[in-house]
Amino acid sequence: MRSSIITLVLLLSIGVSWAGDRNRIIALGVRNFTYTPKEGKETVGSALGSIASVLITGQNTTQQPQYKDAVRAAIVRGLTSGFRTIATDMGNIGEQTNATFDYYVDATINNISTTTKTESTTTTKNGVNTYYKAMVGITLQFKDSQTEEVIASPMFKISDVDVAWIETEESAITSTLRKLSAYVGRYCNRKYPIYGTILESARQSKDKQKEVYIDLGTNLGAYKGLHLTAYTVKTIAGKETKIQVGKLKIMDVQGEDISFCKIQSGGKEIKNILDKGETIFVKSTE
């Protein structure tokens, strides 16, 4: 009995350490942004074609470099919105500062543009309504702060099919940049997920686990509706092996480090593992 208790305590201690190490905050230093729009060489033919397109469709697309600082701010917001990422805007500098970062983030902006269209109307004095869409395309480079090695180069593109027509240019830009921040934040959450463990059973049937409590909550940004995978961890020859056993969904965040979850798959196996007193880990998937 004493041996079993010691073993259980050791397993729980390993679980807390394992999850805690993986939930460390990632510090990002946002550095250099370059604006390099992809513009083809204009010929007489292409110019005439553009004019014809405007006349036929009533739409015209224009690069808007004056919004590049707004794009930068949107990216910083997105990077900071991740579960485990905090971004500091270092300005357009190349040298290191006294601050310590895990990674630097540089970016290339290849598109900041708006498309306008006009429609005839009887509700305005000039008989025309103008509407706007804003598009943006960027590539981020995550670089090791010690070696400058590029470890990831995600691309984000918001095209005209991703946004709706809006009545002012500024509102169109704001809407698109809000979407850009969300895309960047989602990328960070997938790259740097949060980890936890199942605390205890909440509800079960004869042979299947239905609901559980986990040790993730508001302190790491867990929210109602967040999906997670559940798995066990074994160490073989000094290497971790993860075995997925099910999927969970947070139904209610009940505190800084506790949430109530519904088991969506793997209920039978999860119950068997919990009945043995073994630790089950969880990881966010979105």
Place the predicted regions along the sequence by residue.
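C-terminal/domain-edge helix-coil "capping" segments
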Residues: 20-22, 145-216, 220, 224, ...
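A short, hydrophobic beta-strand-centered structural micro-motif
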Residues: 23-34, 86-141
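Sec-dependent N-terminal signal peptides
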Residues: 4-14
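A structural "domain/chain start" motif
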Residues: 18-83, 194-211, 283-286
